[in-house]
Amino acid sequence: MGTPREYEVVLTAEEDGGYSVSVPALPGCTSQGETRDEALAMIREAIEAYIESLVAHGDPIPGPIEIERVTVTA
């Protein structure tokens, strides 16, 4: 078992149902699910596979990034 890591994810409710989820710190690491819980379970698997691929290729594992919320008037 590897080192525990935490990543921020972006969970989006889709218009046609279900959820999509992505990991800003891991470009291209995305998944989806019918429910919020399923989408989160699927992204955990996707993150693990993504990191395993990086390790297999000798690439560095990105750390978490900082996410800030901003307010705009539009």
Spans of model-derived segments:
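Short, positively charged
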Residues: 2-3, 9, 13-15, 33
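A short, exposed loop/beta-hairpin motif centered on an aromatic-Gly-Thr core
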Residues: 27-37
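Short aromatic-glycine-(Arg/Gly/Cys) micro-motifs in beta-strand/loop hairpins
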Residues: 11-26
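Short, surface-exposed helix/turn micro-motifs that flank interaction/cofactor sites
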Residues: 22, 40-41
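Short, charged, surface-exposed hinge/linker loops at domain edges
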Residues: 1-8, 41-74
